[in-house]
Curated annotation (Swiss-Prot):
OVATE domain boundaries: 158-217
Misc. comment: Plants over-expressing OFP8 show flat, thick and cyan leaves, and enhanced apical dormancy.
Null allele phenotype: No visible phenotype under normal growth conditions.
Tissue: Expressed in roots, rosette and cauline leaves, shoots, stems, flower buds and siliques.
Species annotation: Arabidopsis thaliana
Compartments in which it is found: Nucleus
Record-linked InterPro entries: Ovate (IPR038933), Ovate_C (IPR006458)
Biased composition (Acidic residues): 124-138
A Gene Ontology BP annotation from the UniProt entry: negative regulation of DNA-templated transcription
Chain residue ranges for the region called Disordered: 124-147
Protein name (database record): Transcription repressor OFP8
A GO CC term assigned to this protein in UniProt: nucleus
Keywords: Nucleus, Repressor, Transcription, Transcription regulation
Length: 221
């Protein structure tokens, strides 16, 4: 029994030693060559596979439009606008002043010496030099009636030298409101635009101030 055990142990030791012995140079070189071929083929396959991968066209990348935020309009914007903002947006183009006579709000024709009149002075188109020399010249509305019936009354604009533009504009605006029975907010705003269009910019501040005071008086609780 002991001899058999020794033989088995010796065989196990020999097999382990034989596995640990160095291999021949030929085997090592052949194994490395096979390994290098395998790795090179794998690398070539990977590289080839990458080149064959189809790229996504750029035209489809941005085909979907970007989502933009949509803000609902404010329905109370028009009602909440102050008259100061309205004054800034009033156009002062003198070429449009001739259209004032055909305004449906004021059915009567505003006349001055038998012709359409919409400037502060007859030489206004020559430049602003005359305005600087004649700063106290204002175009005011006069509600003088040629008939007792207000619906048939005719009014005209007058040019006058004024030392107190505030009082003159206030008197003229009140006369127009009473004569034409202008009490609706929309009609009052249109009246303000008419005053601004007929007068130079240097008087717009006074006109708006007078209008705001009259408007507050009419609609005060």
């Amino acid at each position: 029994m002991e001899k058999r055990m020794k033989l088995r142990v010796s065989r196990i030791v020999r097999s382990s030693l034989s596995s640990c012995r160095p291999r021949d140079l030929y085997d090592v070189v052949e194994t490395c060559a096979v390994t290098s071929k395998a790795t090179s083929s794998e690398r070539f396959f990977v590289t080839k596979a990458k080149t064959k991968t189809p790229s996504r066209p750029k035209s489809h990348a941005s085909s979907c439009p970007r989502a933009s935020p949509i803000f609902p309009p404010n329905p109370f914007y028009e009602e909440s606008r102050s008259f100061r903002d309205l004054r800034k947006k009033v156009k002062t183009n003198r070429k449009q002043r001739s259209q004032f006579g055909s305004d449906p709000l004021f059915a009567s024709r505003f006349k001055s010496t038998g012709s359409w009149y919409w400037s502060c002075s007859e030489e206004e188109d020559e430049g602003d030099k005359e305005e600087s020399e004649d700063d106290d010249s204002d175009t005011l509305f006069s509600s003088r009636s040629f008939s007792s019936d207000s619906s048939k009354a005719e009014s005209f604009a007058v040019v006058k030298k004024s030392k107190d533009p505030y009082e003159d504009f206030r008197t003229s605006m009140v006369e127009m409101i009473v004569e034409r029975q202008i009490f609706a907010p929309a009609e009052l705003q249109q009246l303000l635009q008419c005053f601004l269009s007929l007068n130079s910019r240097q008087h717009h501040k006074v006109i708006v101030q007078v209008f705001l005071e009259i408007y507050a008086t009419l609609f005060s609780p």
